[in-house]
């Protein structure tokens, strides 16, 4: 079980690196599906299979909408995985993850159960995660304010741009 969680975490990081380093939405969608699947495997390993399936279906629906929009706005001949800029970004991100893991010690979340095989924790991981989320109430308020500001700024930015059909008229 510990090996499954470790491999799923590595696949999750590789999927996120694939999304962050690729300029083309066609290939980045593959990284998103990989990251979503690996994240849901991590959730399943903590004992919450129903939550994992629901999150995976919701996430795939959201990715479908975003992929359809970004594929419509993409260049007709996108850069592939082998182009030098993509390889450079992949190496930079992987070196950053490696440096973060080696020098900062990785991630340790207090209160979460590491595995059901260890036997030292009796609470399920999803309930402890909810308790940890609500124990830092100020973080939720900060996230709420940031989301309101982002929605306000994006709304002003979208309204200030001309629509694509207005500029293509002859």
From Swiss-Prot:
Q: Which reaction does it catalyse?
A: a ubiquinone + NADH + 5 H(+)(in) = a ubiquinol + NAD(+) + 4 H(+)(out)
Which chain regions cross the lipid bilayer? Answer: 1-21, 26-46, 49-69, 86-106, 138-158
- Please indicate which superkingdom the organism of origin belongs to: Eukaryota
Q: What is its main location?
A: mitochondrion
Q: What class of enzyme is it?
A: translocase
**May I have one GO cellular component term?**
mitochondrion
Q: What is its EC number?
A: 7.1.1.2
GO BP term (any one): mitochondrial electron transport, NADH to ubiquinone
| UniProt entry tagged with the keyword Thylakoid | no
A molecular function (GO) term: NADH dehydrogenase (ubiquinone) activity
Q: Which InterPro entries match?
A: ComplexI_Subunit6, NADH_UbQ/plastoQ_OxRdtase_su6, Nuo/plastoQ_OxRdtase_6_NuoJ
Protein function: Core subunit of the mitochondrial membrane respiratory chain NADH dehydrogenase (Complex I) which catalyzes electron transfer from NADH through the respiratory chain, using ubiquinone as an electron acceptor. Essential for the catalytic activity and assembly of complex I.
Assigned protein family: Belongs to the complex I subunit 6 family.
Q: What name has this protein been given in UniProt? A: NADH-ubiquinone oxidoreductase chain 6
Which species expresses this protein natively? Xenopus laevis (African clawed frog)
User: Which gene name belongs to this protein?
Assistant: mt-nd6
